[in-house]
């Protein structure tokens, strides 16, 4: 009898020890990755990043643990890509077109009136993805997924009838391309870091703002601007990426899992963006912001100016960029 009890105790001890060893092994060999993001934690992009991290943790059985660091958590918006590129932090999220100092190809999805719907934006992404991945790889960064913001419009304090109504008004360019486009419209650029944008808007330092309907909550736009013009000008993508050095520390199994999760999150994100756009437009109306469709004349004036921007981009980008543009135009 005593021998049987001793065997049962020993068996139970061995099982407990085995569980503890497994837990210890997982904790010791877990790869913990920090991921700073530039957006408020309640934005749909931030929520996608959080779901991505949670799913990766679950499907790798805690071997890969991603910690999403919300806005103002240590890295400024403009510092994130460089920090990942130089392996100072493992992962990050950034507006692709704001990285145009890294490559002119990153301006592609912000070319005004090139891709003005989700379908067009996705087609543009498909034809350019391989080139984007190659440019990022050269910079020691791997693309995981890309999701667009809703289409860009224009916030104004006063009603706009023609482009003459925009001349001399201040705006914040968030890339070289938006700077060029804004200037072509007669706007005056004002440099405002992203982390200072909400304050600049509240102090009425900007007369107009390019942004989607979903930008209002993040920066308090509805408290300052009376109109939002639904230009459908472009759909800029937010990208999530990892340093190549950190990527190569993952096993092939975990790499496959991360890419699988990223693909699902990307697909979910494009749908979430559409929903965020619809919800944000309703919220703008609730906040007494007038949603305006530009007149036929005004839209035509915007498009004529955009052609000059696209032509200049094509002149500067070189053969690889023109090839991507031509493939898209043939779709």
Question: In which residue ranges do the predicted regions lie?
Answer:
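N-terminal secretory/targeting leader peptides
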Residues: 31-120, 128-132, 136-331
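Short beta-strand-centered segments that line the small-molecule binding cleft or hinge
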Residues: 123
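Bacterial N-terminal signal peptides
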Residues: 15-26
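A composition/secondary-structure signal for short, hydrophobic, low-basic-content segments
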Residues: 4, 22-23, 30
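Bacterial N-terminal signal peptides that target proteins for export
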Residues: 3-17
